[in-house]
Curated annotation (Swiss-Prot):
Pfam families: SOCS_box, WD40. The gene is WSB1. PROSITE patterns: SOCS (PS50225), WD_REPEATS_1 (PS00678), WD_REPEATS_2 (PS50082), WD_REPEATS_REGION (PS50294). It comes from the Eukaryota. InterPro entries: G-protein_beta_WD-40_rep, SOCS_box, SOCS_box-like_dom_sf, WD40/YVTN_repeat-like_dom_sf, WD40_repeat_CS, WD40_repeat_dom_sf, WD40_rpt, WSB_SOCS-box_domain. This is WD repeat and SOCS box-containing protein 1. Residues 372-421 form the SOCS box domain. GO terms for biological process: intracellular signal transduction; protein aggregate center assembly; protein K27-linked ubiquitination; protein polyubiquitination. Pathway: Protein modification; protein ubiquitination. The SOCS box domain mediates the interaction with the Elongin BC complex, an adapter module in different E3 ubiquitin ligase complexes.
Length: 421
């Protein structure tokens, strides 16, 4: 068994070195809580980075301060970096000038994180109520944490204070995602087999339950225009939901094992899913077609072997913001960087016991969390996107596949716009 296709010379693949790391604190800690770093997240505006460092705690650090420390000290631990001064408004509209690091004790094992930002003119989708307990400012930045006991806690990023405690799930909250449109609509995925939709502008009202999964739900992700949601889970499940009507659009068939991670491309034209079957699939979410397969074990395993303990479980997948690259993390102690038009990785990096990964807001850095609660960072593959690709992304942001196929243009151009060449 090999990690790369036979035609690929493993020695010719570029191997990256970390540019920095954030190490988990040492003991003593409550031994009842694990050290695993199940989730990492970057703020939408690139101002903060958060990760669950195990032992019930989440650490928030100014991202620019992290980068400065990486440049000054290489891969030294920067968990004690100094605070960064940036202007902000609190929930009451007052000015604060000292956003800084925060260590948040969430009270239970943290399985999921998500940043959410507020756009005041975006009205609540639920009801029009004149009075609210919380009125979020224009530059409000929130952090949602999903816990082992089924609770979701909402924190003010700038102060580290608890704002809301959302209670409705009965099992682990495995993933969280905010709608990118600034509406502060939050979706949670849980081991209780449900997804729940929360309206934080309506004081955290739980407005909808999405049912359809027959087993654990591992992950969920909004499309860039917030109109579609992907959820993935055990028993090969990949579901797409209409988030205007809160109805299921379709179920995607193809994986042979639990599907544990998903992410949309920046233009919403592609969907990446990662599975324990050793594969990452790139889908067209508008028609359910598989456009590309990224294998992590060769020769490709049979469905029976892929559906078992194959030692190549893919744990996480993330789309870069250039729309050209995808990162995946697997149990073979390797992080892979892929181009969407190549079926082999263009760069790799060693990582033992990895659990999660995410690109920074500008796509220049990849962060990955591990079993021991630490985070490692790599500079990502960079290239100037072609004008053709930029035009394709602009078109696909506003036009689904069905409308593209109806355009009176040459077939080769249709294939390019549909990501088939």
């Amino acid at each position: 068994m090999a990690s790369f296709p036979p035609r690929v010379n493993e020695k010719e693949i570029v191997r990256l070195r970390t540019i920095g790391e954030l190490l988990a604190p040492a003991a003593p800690f409550d031994k009842k809580c694990g050290r695993e770093n199940w989730t990492v997240a970057f703020a939408p505006d690139g101002s903060y980075f958060a990760w669950s460092q195990g032992h019930r705690t989440v650490k928030l650090v100014p991202w620019s301060q992290c980068l400065q420390n990486f440049l000054l000290h290489g891969t030294k631990n920067v968990t004690n970096s100094s605070s960064l001064r940036l202007p902000r408004q609190n929930s009451d509209g007052g000015q604060k000038n000292k956003p800084r690091e925060h260590i948040i004790d969430c009270g239970d094992i943290v399985w999921s994180l998500a940043f959410g930002s507020s756009v005041p003119e975006k009205q609540s989708r639920c009801v029009n109520i004149e009075w609210h307990r919380f009125r979020f400012g224009q530059d409000q930045l929130l952090l949602a944490t999903g816990l082992n006991n089924g609770r979701i806690k909402i924190w003010d990023v700038y102060t580290g204070k608890l704002l809301l405690n959302l209670v409705d799930h009965t099992e682990v909250v495995r993933d969280l995602t905010f709608a990118p449109d600034g509406s502060l609509i939050l979706v949670s995925a849980s081991r209780d087999k449900t997804l729940r939709v929360w309206d934080l502008k309506d004081d955290g009202n739980m407005m909808k339950v999405l049912r359809g999964h027959q087993n654990w739900v591992y992950s969920c992700a909004f499309s860039p225009d917030s109109s579609m949601l992907c959820s993935v889970g055990a028993s090969k499940a990949v579901f797409l939901w209409n988030m205007d009507k809160y109805t299921m659009i379709r179920k995607l068939e193809g994986h042979h094992h639990d599907v544990v991670a998903c992410d949309f491309s920046p233009d919403g034209a592609l969907l990446a899913t990662a599975s324990y079957d050793t594969r990452v699939y790139i889908w067209d979410p508008h028609n359910g077609d598989i456009l590309m397969e990224f294998g992590h074990l060769f020769p490709p395993p049979t469905p029976i072997f892929a559906g078992g303990a194959n030692d190549r479980w893919v744990r996480s997948v993330s789309f870069s913001h250039d729309g050209l690259h995808v990162a995946s993390l697997a149990d073979d102690k390797m992080v892979r960087f892929w181009r969407i038009d190549e079926d082999y990785p263009v760069q790799v990096a060693p990582l033992s016991n990895g659990l999660c990964c995410a690109f920074s807001t500008d796509g220049s850095v990849l962060a990955a969390g591990t079993h021991d609660g630490s985070v490692y960072f790599w500079a990502t593959p960079r290239q100037v996107p072609s004008l053709q690709h930029l035009c394709r992304m602009s078109i696909r942001r506003v036009m689904p596949t069905q409308e593209v196929q109806e355009l009176p243009i040459p077939s080769k151009l249709l294939e390019f716009l549909s990501y088939r060449i």
